[in-house]
Amino acid sequence: MGQQPAKSMDVRRIEGGEILLNQLAGRMIPKGAVTWSGKYPTIDHLLDHVQTMEEINTLQQQGAWPAGAGRRVGLTNPTPQEIPQPQWTPEEDQKAREAFRRYQEERPPETTTIPPSSTPPWKLQPGDDPLLESKSLLETHPLYQNPEPAVPVIKTPPLKKKMSGTFGGILAGLIGLLVSFFLLIKILEILRKLDWWWISLSSPKGKMQCAFQDTGAQISPHYAGSCPWGCPGFLWTYLRLFIIFLLILLVAAGLLYLTDNGSTILGKLQWASVSALFSSISSLLPSDQKSLVALMFGLLLIWMTSSSATQTLVTLTQLATLSALFFKN
């Protein structure tokens, strides 16, 4: 119990060589402070290193290098084990020669011979070679010939483009331009109303006249926010409109950011009631896409040609319809 098998002589020699190399290498590594500056070794370290290398060279020259211990310093074993070379006796050599000669005599001779190739003529007539009569190699090769179809193919003339498709595309483009134009007008109208509200908050009710009409420009009296072309306040008016538009975009971006972070306005409300409202609206909507487009276009026309109160109601209806469509999809 607890006993280990005895080590062989080769293992003991390898371990002894490793211990010897560790002791010799320990003397070569400088220990402690090298010099006062710490840059150069002292003479004692140099002599110790030279003495150690002389001892290693002496062991290597005498052949007393232990087997396998050279891996410690990266040297090969100076006395490797030689591979024994096979030794042939004269009788075995003669017997092998006789066996090879007998094999050569008993082996059957080769019967396959290559027939001599005839020298081709230098010139060929058109009737001698079918490749010369055809225009290309693909026409004579059977793999590249077009086989006859098993099923007859009926070729139909290409269909001509109808004018209705082209006219429909032009009409859709004109409708898109018309809708974009009216939307731009309505957006400018909304921005002007917001600008007028902004001016009314910062100015008294009796002093709503433009402050730039007395600067010498030949323009008629007008209110602030409705400056005509040529008035110095025209640029300031559109600058205020641009600032209001940027503020609206900033508010929309903030709502989108809150939506991405999960703290939306709908999240603060009762989601069950909102989803029930959207589901009821989506159940009333037609399933045909053309009917939905016609409904939205009709609501857009009503919004563009109605008063402010009606526009508010139509806008709320459009938002509810779009939300219901989003919820349905």
From Swiss-Prot:
**For bias kind Basic and acidic residues, which ranges apply?**
92-109
Lipid anchor positions (N-myristoyl glycine): 2
Fetch the InterPro entries from UniProt. Answer: HBV_HBSAG
Ranges facing Cytoplasmic side: 2-237, 186-237, 313-329
Segments spanning the bilayer are 165-185, 238-258, 292-312
Entry-linked Pfam families? vMSA (PF00695)
Glycosylated position list: 261
Q: Which family does it belong to?
A: Belongs to the avihepadnavirus major surface antigen family.
Name listed for the protein in its UniProt record: Large envelope protein
Native species of this protein? Duck hepatitis B virus (strain China)
Q: Which gene encodes it?
A: S
